[in-house]
Amino acid sequence: MAHFAINCFSDILQMSVNLNVILPQRTTRHGFTGSTPDGKFPVLYLLHGMGDDQTIWQRRTAIERYVEGTPLAVVMPTTHLGFYTDMHHGLPYWSFFSQELPALCQQFFPQLTDRREYTFAAGNSMGGYGAVKLALGMPDQFGKAVSLSGALDLVGMEKHTPATPLMQNIFGSTEQLTGSDNDLLALAEKTCKTHTNLPKLRICCGTEDPLLPFSRSAKARLIQLGYDVTYQESPGVHDWAYWDAQIRQAIPWLLEGMEM
């Protein structure tokens, strides 16, 4: 695998942004094995959780080893504390992720596919929210999404525990969040009314994770709306031991049915 650390300017955010990228490389040296597809690389946008950045997946998991021997490219960007959202008070991160980031990746790495069925998103916690939001908000561009302990039912969470000032800066009040495109279950309902080719979703949560009730409520509503949901609960808390194991299991699911 080849690793790239990118720093570039975002016109939407009006600042420099960082992203790490892993690309397949044909090699058998030093214990690595690698291959490249005949066509373009399928691509996984791998999103971090709150308080982390574009480096965290390579620091806390063996993601590079998990994708070696596959044609999968991995793009790891950062949203800082922006929750992959056009913030109520702050920066327009959703516009960056949905409009500018894919175009930048195509510009820098033209070997990345732009085919929906080979474009994926995954993330942990806040990143799980972002991954599912990309799939629901851009169903013509993303074929699959993986949420690991994702904050998928924010409205339910805020009914259980009042929103912090940080969350209010991101989403506004609970009333402003409810029914908006930042409310994933409302977005899911909107998308299933306007699209027939819906993204496939994989939702995983540890049985000792405080977000488990909200993973269950999100799963139930998504299935009710007609989404293809692969759901898994297994022992684990809200930590990297759980996410490392689950992203490893998710890679074959993402590539399922793909000739390699």
PLM features per residue range, with description:
Residues M1-M260:
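Non-catalytic cap/lid and distal C-terminal segments of serine-dependent acyl enzymes
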